[in-house]
């Protein structure tokens, strides 16, 4: 008796099933790695790290003051530029995440206090009297 040929969707379902089972087996190990890396990388600097940070900052200042950047190769300068841009871009992404809005801070229409509104109205009234 001949076996029936699997359709495209049956093959797809079999493939996704195998991939899912593999990923489900790997998940606990990957989660443990993610937690360990996150705990290490996202931790604030310890007091023991401060001297190394100061030394690196001093080296960077000396590098800029003595204009050693003119001696960099094209590849090195592109790598350093890419790293600097990445830091700047992630800063802006963090700002967007922090304010929970992409284009700026959401300011309610009644943000201006009553006191400020009263002062503006008084200035307008005085300006109208003078005119």
From Swiss-Prot:
Biological process, per Gene Ontology: proton motive force-driven ATP synthesis
Subcellular location: Mitochondrion membrane
Membrane-spanning segments: none
Flavoprotein listed as a keyword: no
MF annotations from Gene Ontology: proton transmembrane transporter activity
UniProt superkingdom: Eukaryota
GO cellular component, one term: proton-transporting ATP synthase complex
Alphabetic keyword roster: ATP synthesis, CF(0), Hydrogen ion transport, Ion transport, Membrane, Mitochondrion, Transport
PANTHER family per the UniProt record, alphabetical: ATP SYNTHASE SUBUNIT
Record note on quaternary structure: Subunit of the F-type ATPase which has 2 components, CF(1) - the catalytic core - and CF(0) - the membrane proton channel.
Family stated for the protein in its record: Belongs to the ATPase g subunit family.
Protein purpose: Mitochondrial membrane ATP synthase (F(1)F(0) ATP synthase or Complex V) produces ATP from ADP in the presence of a proton gradient across the membrane which is generated by electron transport complexes of the respiratory chain. F-type ATPases consist of two structural domains, F(1) - containing the extramembraneous catalytic core, and F(0) - containing the membrane proton channel, linked together by a central stalk and a peripheral stalk. During catalysis, ATP synthesis in the catalytic domain of F(1) is coupled via a rotary mechanism of the central stalk subunits to proton translocation.
Protein name: Probable ATP synthase subunit g 1, mitochondrial
């Amino acid at each position: 008796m001949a076996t029936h040929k699997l359709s495209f969707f049956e093959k797809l379902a079999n493939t996704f099933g195998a991939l899912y089972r593999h990923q489900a087996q790997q998940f606990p190990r990957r989660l443990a790695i993610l937690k360990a890396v996150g705990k290490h990388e996202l931790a604030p600097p310890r007091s023991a790290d401060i001297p190394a940070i100061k030394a690196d900052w001093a080296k960077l200042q000396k590098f800029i003051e003595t204009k050693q950047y003119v001696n960099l190769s094209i590849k090195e300068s592109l790598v350093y530029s890419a790293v600097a841009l990445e830091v700047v871009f992630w800063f802006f992404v963090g700002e967007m995440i922090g304010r929970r809005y992409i284009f700026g801070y959401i300011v309610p229409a009644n943000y201006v206090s009553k006191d400020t509104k009263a002062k503006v109205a008084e200035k307008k009234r005085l300006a109208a009297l003078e005119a």
